[in-house]
């Protein structure tokens, strides 16, 4: 009887901890204050016989070659990370002040 109670409590604690970990991971994944973007630069990169990678000279600045370990080819990608939490939340008065003003005069 004592062993069954102890086993039941262990299982209950394990389930509780699992739910807490799941909840914290999904909450962190849904953070709307962070944005990570990846864009394809329109070209691929290759590794030559000397072991150096071809440069990524695409339309966009900041293109880098990303490749899997052991592969001789990769993709030229541009990555950008934006943390919106560094910007304050605009108040309604700031939004009103930033709106374009409507001209009430009529042009002929």
UniProtKB/Swiss-Prot annotation:
Q: Where is the signal peptide?
A: 1-28
Q: Where is this region: Disordered?
A: 89-108
Keyword terms, alphabetized:
Disulfide bond, Glycoprotein, Secreted, Signal
Residues that carry a glycan: 44
GO annotation terms (biological process): negative regulation of chemokine activity
Q: Which Cys residues form disulphide pairs?
A: 41-63, 45-65, 56-76
Q: In which compartments does the protein localize?
A: Secreted
One cellular component term from this protein's GO annotations in UniProt: extracellular region
Name the principal localization, coarsely classed: secreted
Asked whether the keyword Disulfide bond is assigned, the reply is yes
> Per UniProt, what is one GO molecular function of this protein?
chemokine binding
Q: Where are the transmembrane segments?
A: none
Biased composition range(s): Basic and acidic residues: 96-108
| Biological role | Salivary chemokine-binding protein which has chemokine-neutralizing activity and binds to host chemokines CXCL1, CXCL2, CXCL3, CXCL5, CXCL6 and CXCL8.
Provide the protein name.
Evasin P1156
Q: Which organism is it from?
A: Ixodes ricinus
